[in-house]
Design a protein with these regions (language model features):
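Proline-aspartate-enriched helix->loop->beta-strand connector
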Residues: 261-262
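Extended non-catalytic accessory segments flanking core domains
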Residues: 1-236, 245-258
Length: 262
C-alpha cells in the first residue's frame, strides 16, 4: 500500500507440504493472518505460483532508527543496508549464528556513566536504536559448519573480529525471540577493520596475566533424564546435553588453552 508505517511484505507459513517456488515467483496465497510470537504471518491453506522471473528491489534501511519499533514497518521485506556496519557483538554466534551489527562502536554504558544516571539511560537507548541482529538463515542450534557473514564457511582462514565491518548487508527482516533480525539472502562484503595484534605492547614488566572463560563447562550432562545435581541434589545439571557435545567442548577448550602458550 506504500504507506510508510506498514510493511510491504509478509511471511507465509504453510504446513500443507512442499511448494515448488523460487526467488522471483509471483504467488497467490489463501489463508488467515495471524501473529506468531510477534511476527505477522499468513497461515496459508493454499499457495499457487502464478508467474516467475519477477525482480524485487531491496528497500534501503540505515542505522540508527528513530524508534524501537521502527523495523516493524519492514517486517517480511527484502532490505539492504547501504552503510558500513560494525560487528559489535557475537556472543550467540557459535550457538545460533547471530551477530549484532551497529553503525558505530558502543561502550557498555556502565563503563562510562553512573548506573541509573540520565547519561547511562541515554547511552543504553542509543545502543538499542543502533543495532540489528544478523542471523544465518538457519534455525539449528550449534550449527556445523558455522557461516561467516560473507556467506562462506567460518574457519581459521575466514575469520572475523569485533570491530570489523560489513557492507551491503541484504536480507529479509524477521522478528523472533524478541529481536528484529536480518535473515540474509546473500553474503555481505566483509572488511577487516580491527586486526588482532601479534603481541601486546611492551610495558617493561616481567609478569604475564592469562585467563580463559570456559563458559558452561561442567562434567555433568544436562540430558533431561539424569540431570539432578547440586549439594542437595535439588537442581538441574548444567553443561552439555550429550557426551558427544561435552567431548567437542572439551577438545575446543584444551586446544585454545594450549594455543595461548602462557
Amino acid at each position: 500500500d506504500d504507506y510508510p508505517y506498514t510493511s510491504e511484505g509478509v511471511y507465509i507459513y504453510y504446513s500443507g507440504g512442499t511448494v515448488d517456488v523460487a526467488t522471483g515467483d509471483e504467488v497467490r496465497v489463501r489463508g488467515t493472518v495471524s501473529e506468531y510470537n510477534g511476527l505477522t504471518e499468513i497461515n496459508a491453506s493454499q499457495v499457487l505460483v502464478c508467474d516467475s522471473g519477477k525482480t524485487v528491489t531491496p528497500t534501503a534501511v540505515t542505522l540508527p532508527v528513530d524508534s524501537l519499533t521502527a523495523f516493524e514497518a519492514y517486517e517480511g521485506m527484502l532490505v539492504t543496508f547501504p552503510q558500513e556496519l560494525i560487528i559489535s557483538e557475537y556472543f550467540n554466534f557459535d550457538q545460533f549464528g547471530e551477530i549484532v551489527l551497529t553503525s558505530e562502536r558502543h561502550m557498555t554504558p556502565t563503563a562510562v556513566y553512573e548506573p541509573g544516571s540520565t547519561e547511562y539511560q541515554a547511552a543504553a537507548l542509543a545502543y538499542q536504536l543502533d543495532k540489528i541482529t544478523l542471523d544465518d538463515g538457519r534455525s539449528a542450534s550449534n550449527p556445523d559448519p558455522a557461516l561467516h557473514p560473507n556467506g562462506a564457511v567460518f574457519n581459521m582462514d575466514n575469520l572475523f573480529r569485533g570491530g570489523d565491518k560489513l557492507a551491503n548487508v541484504t536480507g529479509v527482516i524477521d522478528y523472533s525471540f524478541n529481536l528484529y533480525r536480518i535473515q540474509p539472502t546473500e553474503g555481505a562484503d566483509y572488511i577487516s577493520a580491527n586486526p588482532r595484534p601479534a603481541e601486546p605492547e611492551e610495558v617493561g614488566g616481567t609478569l604475564k596475566v592469562v585467563s580463559m572463560n570456559t563458559l558452561n563447562y561442567f562434567t555433568t550432562l544436562d540430558d533431561g533424564v539424569n540431570d539432578i545435581c547440586g549439594p542437595d541434589q535439588l537442581q538441574e545439571c548444567r553443561g552439555a546435553d550429550t557426551l558427544e557435545e561435552f567431548n567437542r567442548q572439551h577438545a575446543k577448550l584444551v586446544a585454545a588453552i594450549v594455543e595461548m602458550d602462557p
